[in-house]
Structure formats: C-alpha cells, structure tokens
Amino acid sequence: MNKLLTTLIALCSLYCGAAAATAANYDNPDTLVVARDGTGQFRTVTEAVEVCRAFMDYHKVIFIKKGTYKEKLIIPQWLQNIELCGEDRDLTVITYDDHANITMDGSFWPKELKDQLLAMGDRPKLGTFRSFTVRIDANNITLKNLTIENNAARLGQAVAIHTQGDRLTFVNCRFLGHQDTVYTGMPGTRLYFSSCYIEGTTDFIFGPSTAWFEQCVIHCKANSYITAASTPKEIMYGYIFNNCTVTAAADVEKVYLGRPWRDYGYTLFMNCELPAQIRPEGWHHWQKEREQTARYMEYNNRGPGAATGQRVGWSRLLSKKEAQQITLENVFSLKSEWTPVAP
C-alpha cells in the first residue's frame, strides 16, 4: 500500500477510532476516503454515501479530508452504521447556501428533491424544511470532527443540519448558520451532541426530538431565542443542555433560553454557564396559552445570566432529587436501550 494511503489510515485511527486503524480495515473496504483534490476514492461526500450498502450490519467510516465541500447531502433512511469523520473539525466543511425564501429550481440537488420539485410544478418557495445543507434520515449515524454550515444570507430560515433518524451522535462538530441552524425533525428520535459548537440567531435549535447536548458551546449571534422545542405531550424529554457554555456576540444585549414552538415544548439547562445577555425572565411563551403547558426548567447553572429570581412564573427550578434522575441512561432508554458513548 502506498505511503499516502498509509498516512490516511493513521489519521483515521487518530480522529475516528478503530474502524480505519489498519491497512486491512481499509482494504476490506470498510473505510472510504473523500478528498477534493482527488487523492481519495471520491471527490464528494455524496458519492461516498451513495456506494454504501443498504441496512449494513457492520460499521463503515467515511473519512473526509480537509477541504470545503459545497453539496446538499442526504443520508437516506435505508443506510445505517455509518460514521462521517473529518480530518480537521474547522477545515473539513460541508456547506450550502439555500434559505426558505429561494424560488426553487432544483439545480445541483439530489434526485429525490428534484423529483419533489417537478411534482409541484409551479416553482414555489423552498421553505424551511428543504433549506438544509445536510439531512440525516438514517438511524445509527455518527458525525465527528466536521463543520456543517448553511452560509445563506440572512433572508429567511436556513437549516444547516436536519435530522430525521434515531440514535444519531455528533462529536466535536460545528454547526454554523443564522436562523434555524439545527432542526431536530422527528418526534421520538434521540440525538447526542458532545463537545460541539452551535451558533445562530433565531430559534437556532428547534424541533420535536429528544436531544442531549453535553459540553457544547452555544453561541448567540443576535438578540433572539436559542431554542424552539416542539416536544410532543406524550414524550417525557426534549432538549437537555448539560455542562454547556452559552456565549453571545459583543453587540448582543438580550437572549431568551427558549420559547415553545408547540404547546408542550421541553427544554432544560443544567450545570451550564449562562452569560449576562440572558434575559432576567429567561423564557418567552411565544403564545400566552403555552404558559400552561410548556415544560421549561433549570438546575445548578452559573454565570451572570443564571440568576433565577426574576424568571417567569411558569418555568421551574428542579430539585436536586429531580435533577439526579436526568441521566443519559434514563432519558434515552424510554424508547429502547441506547446509551451513546463519545470517544
């Protein structure tokens, strides 16, 4: 095996764990290499995803070399057990620039989206839920050491990552955008974000999924709302931020922790660092009647924005006993056993 491939295997071992650790693993081939400069097997991430077998019962790594990949990527629902691993978090970037108010023409889109467009006939606006850069419909998918970006101008909602699958893990990733950066789109699905950076303006983490954010940096780029949970009534947990750090741009003055997109939205910040830009009331109701149903909580936060004396009366402070029940095992095992492990 030539020196280049040997080097790539070493990099995968360092950044992605065991799947790409040896030449034998590369040759079988359970590791695919993507490189814009042609030194891998594929030049785009989409090409690598398309060669993966449906419903694989083994682990496959797609190793993505440093570079900027402008593509609208869909990981379809018939795939599973795939890990997308970047060579460098900040220098391995998947980016696109769609936003909700673009008139659709389907250029450079995956065939699935082009077919939807043709069926509509009258070239409507793109809308929030087609504006994604990456959409994950599959289960058991991991992303590591990657930047997912929607770099559209601030002309409407612009999703960077749109999730539909269950048991999705994101480790040391950046999610960059403005409004609606991270859309967790399917009720009952479970997502785990570890050591990630997420930025945005309005409602930039939103949707109905159950998602745990561990040691993440949440950066507010404008006066607005961090979360817009739409957790269904029958689902016990929505968004949980644990040991996270919330930051804000220098010109930002007021930020709400969240507002309920639907009646029973669930959001909990615990053991987090909150900046002075967090509004004293903490939360917004979106619609007055949601004060009766929204599930908004805090526990053991710190920093200038963590004072709870002026919080809205319909939010709650958890007791120590209640907080002890909020564990990964408890939150993610309600549907089936799953405890994600972030190496």
Regions found by a protein language model. Name each.
Residues 24-343:
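Sequence-level preference for short, compositionally simple segments enriched
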